[in-house]
Amino acid sequence: MDILLGVGTLVLVLVIMTLFLKYAPYGKQGLQALSGAACATFLPQAFLSYAIGGVFDIKFLQDIGDLAGSLSGIAVGILTCLNLGVAPVFAVIVGLVLHDFKLLPAFIAAYGVAFLIKWIEKKVPEGLDLIVVILIAPAIAFGLASIITPGVLATLKQIGSAVTAVGDNNPYALAVILGLVIPVTGMTPLSSMVLTSLLGLTGVPMAIGALTCTGSSFVNLILFRKLNIGGPSKAFAVCIEPLT
């Protein structure tokens, strides 16, 4: 039962992300911003704080990595607005107020506010639009993120617990599941780093996912090179992405 629940939750997350990608306005740009923010914050944290700073006990690098990892809300807020065509100054205004929020709630808030800002840019005269955005956008972004954060985090915790339960009961089954899902996710606009961070995979499940990705990423590299899909850079990208 735990295996079915874990597989079902993984599939549900992928289906929701795919539907958002296909049917939501600026869905692809939004997910690219989400993926970019995850890579810009969590990847430096993983390398600097854990892989280098933690292993060699270099506190300076640990502090830098932890700082980068704590700014995911700002990063996703700015990148989401920029990808949706919002002026850079307005994007930074929105991103800064999302400092204390996790990746997904901050993304949802920034995604919604971006459409409001685009409407303001069209309707309000240039120069005055800055004042209007300052008065409206930060408050709405902060309020929206505050409202949805408890529900979003509780849902993600339940999903992550279901996946973790599979690893506790049958690690081989979880290896098969993650070995299939994560590399395939890395070959799409969806990011495997975003997927694993949203699911909250840590400890044994993350280790299982890393082991399976090591083999399947190499297969991706050979497959793309032999089939001449997208050239050498594309083959290298689909190999490296799941390993992040």
Show the residue positions of the predicted features:
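Pore-lining transmembrane helices
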Residues: 2-244
